[in-house]
Regions:
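Extracytoplasmic soluble-region selector
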Residues: 1-45
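Short structured motifs
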Residues: 10-11, 61-67, 111-116
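Low-complexity, acidic Ser/Thr/Pro/Gly-rich terminal tails and inter-domain linkers that flank the onset
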Residues: 46-72
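Surface-exposed edge beta-strand/loop patches
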Residues: 47-50, 132-162
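Short, well-ordered beta-strand segments enriched in hydrophobic/aromatic residues
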Residues: 76-84
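The feature marks short-to-medium sequence segments in extracytoplasmic or secretory-pathway proteins
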Residues: 83-122
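Short, solvent-exposed, Trp/other aromatic-anchored flexible loops in extracytoplasmic proteins
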Residues: 106-147
């Protein structure tokens, strides 16, 4: 590897990404020829569009995951938006559930809470963050590609104060 801080190559020939960036990997064949391959290492992060009031049906509230990544301890950090397109302040979401599925539709992580406390005023949106501990992950963080995962978020009717 031209830059060992970006990517390294094992003795068996496997390329391992170290940190985000670009580098070149040179391979010397048994016949003496050299092959050069450009390698691009991308961070294991999911990012999507944030939910807005205009995306939410009138007199309803909406939930949407817009960011996910692994922290330094291996926990999956998920950020989501709550958009309140109704009169009254939302104070909690009963039975909040976030499910993370990989590209093969297998559940790799989930988060459940019977009552998740929020504070979203009428016709406003707000961002919230939860952390799914690495002990709750169904696979190791090295085997989960967050960029290709699908996120499902749901909750029962949120409690509102008028």
């Amino acid at each position: 590897s031209a830059n060992k801080q970006i990517a390294t190559v094992t003795n068996s020939g496997k390329v391992i990404g170290k940190k985000e960036g670009n580098t070149k990997v040179t391979v010397k064949l048994t016949n003496g020829k050299k092959l050069i391959c450009n390698v691009s290492v991308k961070s294991n992060k999911y990012s999507g569009k944030k939910l807005t009031i205009s995306d939410t049906t009138y007199n309803q509230y909406g939930l949407k995951v817009y960011s996910a990544y692994f922290d330094n301890k291996g926990n999956l950090v998920v950020k989501f938006m709550v958009a309140n397109n109704s009169y009254g302040k939302l104070t909690k979401i009963p039975k909040l559930k976030i499910t993370v599925k990989d590209s093969k539709k297998n559940v790799v992580a989930s988060f459940k809470k019977n009552s998740y406390t929020i504070n979203v005023n009428s016709y406003k949106s707000k961002s919230y963050t939860i952390s799914i501990p690495k002990s709750s992950l169904k696979k190791s963080k090295d085997k989960i590609d967050v960029r290709t995962c699908t996120f499902t978020i749901s909750g029962k009717d949120a409690d509102a104060t008028l």
